[in-house]
């Protein structure tokens, strides 16, 4: 029932750790080699010291079979990247409460008539769906959501325009949905939520490497309250505030900063500003500084050494308490390196997530959770088809506050995985 952390950096590192190029690129090429199909299947074994992420620390292990298909298409103006996958989890023990299946898909579509950063339009659409098993790894949709069987969906559309060599702008919209598969006979209820966001960004190019950026976003949130006794009513009565507490929330943020390409290999983006979150149907408000930052450094000319860092803060509805809020701070750092003509690849990342729980009805119950995660992954490309890989993960949580007296949410968790992947 605990949170798995991860961050956007995981996806990038996973790509670096995946099978590399040996004699020739894997995949089935069609349409004059503009489209590549990459069918694959992977078999892995995982030992987990703490399946539930609790102080009780019950261990378990499982075999996972993971077939999937990747599709890539690219020409002068178009880019399509799609993945569909399925996982069957065969638990050796501790299986009565765990989902045996997980599956998902991801699609990215992009069109542009701007070349080399010149004047023109770019249209981007992406979406992703995942039905996630409780013991999922740390890469699922940025690690959002507690360690429980759940569905996640997100979609984003962006239209950007570079007007001339100095000015550019973008309009974006995105939707996110988190839906828990609650089973009250086994676990306490968790509250899913959804968000619709609209954003506008403008920039001015000061030099070849530096842009000034200003962005504004507005969000609408909806809390899932199916479990409560008031499930047929719109509102519940807030005992502390003497007002109705509802599941709808809204917020906005305004940020400014710089986006810089120091070289073709080194770039970063730093934004900071102010955010407002009105939750519980307007019963409570939160205001504070907010930030977003990312950095990417391709160190060597051969593209074998990669460093990334990401940090952000944001508000969201609580997943433990209806009509309450959560302030999240995320930070992560990762490196990836290739050896032996790209046959051997190594990646390491560390992440920190701080969650401040703000309760609507009883402020004395507010508490904090600090979650650290570290991971090391190695992969070796045996030949064009086969890759063997191994991964070690460690996660720990510390909590403080009146609600968690006795540190009831604290835990430590180790996971070790070894697997074999075949890509045609």
What are these regions (language model features)?
Residues 1-29:
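Cleavable N-terminal export/targeting peptides
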Residues 19-424:
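Gram-negative and organellar
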């Amino acid at each position: 029932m605990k949170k798995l952390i991860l961050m956007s950096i995981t996806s990038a590192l996973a790509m670096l750790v995946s099978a590399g190029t040996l004699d020739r690129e894997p995949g089935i090429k069609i349409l004059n080699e503009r489209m590549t199909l990459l069918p694959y299947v992977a078999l892995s074994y995982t030992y987990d010291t703490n399946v539930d992420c609790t102080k009780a620390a019950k261990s378990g292990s499982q075999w996972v079979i993971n077939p999937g298909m990747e599709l890539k298409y690219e020409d002068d103006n178009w880019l399509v990247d799609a993945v569909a996958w399925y996982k069957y989890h065969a638990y050796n023990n501790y299986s009565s409460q765990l989902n045996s299946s997980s599956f998902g898909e991801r699609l990215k579509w992009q069109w542009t008539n701007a070349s080399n950063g010149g004047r023109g339009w770019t249209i981007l659409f992406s979406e992703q769906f995942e039905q996630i098993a409780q013991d999922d790894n740390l890469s699922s949709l940025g690690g959002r959501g507690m360690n429980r069987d759940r569905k996640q969906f997100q979609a984003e559309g962006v239209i950007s325009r570079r007007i001339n060599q100095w000015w550019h702008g973008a309009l974006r919209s995105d939707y996110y949905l988190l839906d828990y598969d609650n089973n009250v006979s086994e676990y306490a209820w968790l509250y899913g939520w959804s968000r619709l966001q609209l954003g506008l960004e403008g920039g001015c190019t000061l030099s070849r490497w530096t842009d000034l950026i200003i962005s504004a976003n507005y969000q609408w949130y909806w809390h899932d309250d199916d479990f409560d006794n008031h499930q047929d009513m719109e509102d519940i009565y807030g005992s502390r505030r003497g007002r109705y507490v509802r599941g709808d929330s809204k917020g906005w943020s305004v940020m400014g900063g710089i986006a810089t390409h120091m070289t073709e290999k080194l770039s970063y983006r730093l934004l900071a500003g102010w955010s407002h979150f009105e939750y519980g149907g307007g019963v409570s408000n939160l205001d504070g500084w907010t930030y977003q930052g990312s950095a990417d450094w391709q160190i060597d000319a051969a593209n074998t050494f990669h460093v990334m860092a990401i940090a952000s803060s944001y508000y969201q509805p609580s997943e433990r308490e209806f009509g309450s809020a959560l302030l999240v701070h995320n930070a992560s750092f990762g490196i990836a390196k290739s050896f032996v003509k790209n046959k051997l690849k190594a990646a390491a990342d560390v992440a920190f997530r701080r969650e401040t729980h703000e309760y609507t009805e009883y402020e004395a119950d507010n508490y904090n959770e600090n979650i650290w995660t570290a991971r090391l992954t190695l992969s070796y490309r045996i030949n064009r088809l086969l890759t063997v890989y191994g991964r070690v993960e460690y996660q720990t949580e510390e909590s403080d506050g009146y609600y968690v007296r006795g540190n009831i949410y604290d835990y430590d968790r180790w996971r070790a995985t070894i697997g074999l992947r075949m890509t045609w």
